[in-house]
């Protein structure tokens, strides 16, 4: 049986590729299990940046609803809880994460992409939340994340109407970091990943975690967190080396 999730190393960047192309990378329970296993792989845990991608036709067309035909509501709810846990694990990875998106990125596929820190989409990308039309709603973190990124009004438009949209509109909404030409999503993601891999790992992780915590923080708590994190990082060898290099360049 072919791998449903394939890992490859590109320098210090780990690429996680969904490999269920014949089903447009639909997220079956098996795929979700393979993705959870990939997140524990040492090739990923030892990397400096992780890129998630699919195929030319689809990043992922979303949950495999055909699996739900023989499931009762409790079993379907359990599936979405498990899927949500996988996506939270993606969001909680200490290193930066990038989604490289071509083709369909719908439902659970879009939820997976939104769990990443950055998203690069090419001109073939098609986004959408079709869940309400199926009698459900995005329930693996997508509703939360689209509100945080696009705001409640646009989130209601996207989720309630379920209309599809392309990379340019996704960029305007903030759902995509960069919109690129056809076939350039993965190369650009790898380029960004290589840049991130050169930066101090602890500073990247701390900045990522601080930013993630800000929406749930009061002004006072957010400022305190920021200053506390700065004080810790300022004592690291990375920070000391950077200050020394700056002094050498400026002749101080």
What are the functions of these language-model segments?
Residues 1-14, 162-168, 187, 191-252:
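C-terminal alpha-helix plus adjacent terminal tail
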Residues 1-55, 88:
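Conserved CoA-thioester-binding segment of acyl-CoA-metabolizing enzymes
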Residues 4, 33, 54-89, 105, ...:
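Glycine- (often His-adjacent) and acidic-residue-rich active-site loop
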Residues 13-17, 51-53, 72, 98-100, ...:
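Structural motif
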Residues 16, 20, 35, 52, ...:
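Terminal peptide-recognition signature
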Residues 21-24, 57, 62-68, 104, ...:
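A short, glycine- and basic residue-enriched loop/turn
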Residues 88-202, 232:
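Crotonase-fold acyl-CoA enzyme core
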């Amino acid at each position: 049986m072919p791998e449903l999730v394939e890992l490859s190393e590109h320098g210090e960047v780990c690429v996680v590729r969904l490999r269920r192309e014949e089903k447009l990378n639909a997220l079956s329970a098996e795929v979700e299990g393979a993705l959870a296993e990939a997140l524990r792989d040492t090739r990923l845990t030892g990397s400096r940046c992780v890129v998630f991608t699919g195929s030319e036709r689809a990043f992922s067309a979303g949950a495999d609803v055909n699996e739900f035909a023989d499931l009762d509501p409790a079993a379907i709810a359990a599936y979405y809880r498990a899927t949500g846990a996988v996506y939270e694990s993606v969001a909680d990875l200490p290193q930066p994460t990038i989604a490289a998106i071509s083709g369909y990125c719908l439902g659970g596929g879009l939820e997976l992409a939104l769990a990443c820190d950055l998203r690069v989409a090419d001109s073939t990308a098609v986004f959408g939340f079709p869940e309400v039309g199926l009698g459900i709603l995005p329930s693996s973190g997508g509703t939360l994340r689209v509100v945080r990124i696009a705001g409640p009004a646009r989130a209601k438009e996207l989720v309630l109407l379920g209309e599809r949209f392309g990379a340019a509109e996704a960029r305007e909404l903030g759902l995509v970091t960069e919109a690129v030409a056809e076939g350039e999503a993965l190369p650009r993601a790898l380029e960004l990943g290589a840049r991130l891999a050169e930066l101090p790992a602890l500073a990247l992780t701390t900045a990522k975690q601080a930013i993630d915590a800000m929406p749930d923080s009061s002004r006072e708590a957010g400022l305190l967190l920021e200053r506390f994190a700065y004080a810790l990082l300022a004592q690291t060898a990375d920070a000391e080396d950077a200050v020394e290099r700056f002094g050498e360049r400026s002749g101080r």
